[in-house]
A protein has these predicted regions:
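Extended, low-polarity transmembrane helix blocks
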Residues: 1-53, 75-83, 87, 93-160
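Membrane-interface interhelical connector segments
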Residues: 54-76
């Protein structure tokens, strides 16, 4: 896929032309760096999020989140989600199995949106789906883009 930012006057159909062509080099340099920052920050966010679940314990997570929202078997799902958020968060940070874990986390966010947050409305302050939708879409974008040049996936030369 060509990620070159066009700076010439003849722009192909469907492409945009930079208002200030002098920025093309900056954008081309920053694209992989910015994508890496996004991947790492999302991984850190999942680690921070799962820390609360570990402090509560799987039984409390199962009772307060899964069983309360009709997701059964609640204890099994508590363990699965805690594993996914912990291991997936670390893998996003280092860029290992990036596409797999980003897709799995995007699916988790979709399920959380539909079963837990949607009935509460949009606003995150009221437990709504605002935050979950955003993180889910960012995970989807990471799954499509992959780990990028600054990832273990790239270092080993293989990814899903």
């Amino acid at each position: 896929m060509d990620r070159t930012i066009r700076k010439e006057s003849a722009v192909a159909q469907g492409e945009t032309k930079l208002l200030y062509p002098g920025l093309a080099g900056f954008y081309e340099t920053m694209l992989p760096i910015a994508a890496t920052f996004v991947r790492v920050v999302v991984g850190i966010m999942f680690l921070m999020h799962v820390t609360t679940k570990f402090k509560l314990g799987a039984d409390a997570v199962a009772a307060n989140i899964f069983a309360k929202n009709g997701i059964e078997p609640a204890l099994m799902w508590a363990y699965v989600i805690m594993f996914l958020e912990a291991v997936g968060g670390v893998c996003l940070i280092i860029g290992l199995f990036t596409r797999f874990f980003a897709a799995a986390l995007a699916i988790e966010m979709l399920v959380a949106l539909l079963f837990v947050h949607l009935p509460k409305g949009y606003a995150a302050a009221g437990g709504g789906y605002e935050y979950v939708l955003l993180i889910g879409m960012v995970c989807f974008a990471i799954a499509i883009r992959g780990g990028g040049p600054y990832s273990v996936d790239r270092a080993i030369g293989k990814e899903l």
